[in-house]
Regions:
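Alpha/propeptide regions of enzymes that mature by internal proteolysis
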Residues: 1-310
């Protein structure tokens, strides 16, 4: 796709047409559209891409349909541990948080880490305290409870005989390019249903789940986090573009549909270059994603047949 200003994703996985109600379909599409409209309005005001990706991800964090913020999954102890990261392609500044319990919008805390500390990554209780000190909305764990996620935890703890442990996708992310052709990326997640306490995936790891460099591309990944970390997936896409001259489409496809599966995992990504060319490769059956063009046209894609494997 070309002339894309902002793109978001709601996780890689499989969502066949007919597998959800019409009401749930509308909820997914409406959530993605709200995120796009919110970020697009900022870019139209002349604001930087960094503002747009933060705002878009905040909308998705506030939406219980996605595995981030309000809709985050439960760990094995029945709690939420939230991860997020954000990166500015203009100067490679970045911020990230992992394992936070009481921060309503982890993506905004990640930006605070970038702008108000000398660090890149903060974790756990210290990150939650930093949120309080910097005015990031603070909440109790009760805020994150949803019956759907609780039911998923119970199912994961009691799988059918011979069944595989259940995992949940729906990690969220955003990539954007502004009027100055500065690009940015952001990712936020609750991780895996029934994950061990303290587990951290790729979403808050700069270079694994999130990366942005004005010379190449802005990327937000989703999938099996442990393998995306091992494969340094997001940075690898950028490196292929930088060192070999590969297009965003070719570089992203090579990493997401060739390298990551060769390591034994699946997933997807949204990757946007400074010219507004968007790639959405995935090795899963589908990738929930949406984008908005310069003229304001919105496209949402949630079902597998709308996002054929690439």
């Amino acid at each position: 796709m070309r002339n894309v200003v902002l793109a978001v994703h709601g996780g890689a996985g499989s969502l066949p047409r007919g597998s959800i109600s019409a009401e749930q379909e509308r909820a997914y599409r409406d959530g993605l559209t709200r995120a796009l409209r919110t970020g697009y309005a900022l870019i139209n005001e002349g604001r930087p891409s960094l503002d747009a990706v933060e705002a878009a991800v905040r909308v998705l964090e506030d939406d219980p349909n996605f595995n981030a913020g309000k809709g985050a999954v439960f760990n094995t102890d029945g709690e939420q541990e939230l991860d997020a990261s954000i990166m500015n392609g203009r100067d490679l500044r970045s911020g990230a948080v992992a394992g936070v319990h009481n921060t309503k919008n982890p993506i905004s805390l990640a930006r605070m880490v970038m702008e108000r500390s000398r660090h890149v990554l903060m974790a756990g209780r210290g990150a939650d305290i930093f949120a309080l000190q910097n005015g990031v909305p603070y909440t109790t764990q009760d805020y994150f409870f949803t019956q759907r996620r609780w039911d998923a935890l119970i199912a994961a703890k009691n799988p059918p005989a011979g069944g595989a442990e259940q995992t949940t996708g729906e990690t969220v992310g955003a990539v954007a390019v502004d009027r100055n052709r500065d690009i940015a990326a952001a990712t936020s997640t609750g991780g895996l249903t029934n994950k061990l306490v303290g587990r951290v995936g790729d979403s808050p790891i700069i270079g694994a789940g999130t990366y942005a460099d004005n010379r190449t591309v802005a990327i937000s990944c989703t999938g099996t986090g442990e393998v995306f970390i091992r494969g340094v997936a997001a940075h690898d896409i950028s490196a292929l573009m930088d060192y070999t001259g590969a297009s965003v489409t070719r570089a992203a496809a090579r990493v997401i549909t060739e390298k990551i599966p060769a390591l034994g995992a699946t997933g997807g990504a949204i990757a946007l270059d400074p010219r507004g060319v968007l790639a959405t490769p995935h090795s899963t059956a589908g990738l929930i994603n949406a984008y908005i063009l310069r003229d304001g046209t919105v496209v949402t894609r949630i079902f597998d047949d709308e996002t054929p494997a690439r």
